[in-house]
Amino acid sequence: MIVNGKTLLEYAPIKDMLGHKVRGEITSHGLSEAGYDIRIKQDIIFHEFGVAHEVDGVRGMGRFTLASAIEEFHMPNMLVGIVHDKSTWARMGLSVFNTVIEPG
């Protein structure tokens, strides 16, 4: 089922879900008409040749890392979530592999 922002707010699949969009200095988060923008929990760290370093300024290409969301999901049985890229993340050199948040 595809639902709009109002219906998504009624289902409340995210703990402490915001009912509006908050625009930050670089990215935004919260509810919009087309979905919910989540936030990355931690600083992004890339590991290269056994040495970890924080990305600052120039973004390296072709490296992978894992990140967590600040938001905590509790999907109802009739709703599935899909995580897509955000253009503001892409402008910072981050690309997200699309993933599914399973129902239930």
Whereabouts are the PLM-identified features?
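Non-catalytic terminal segments and appended small domains
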Residues: 1-104
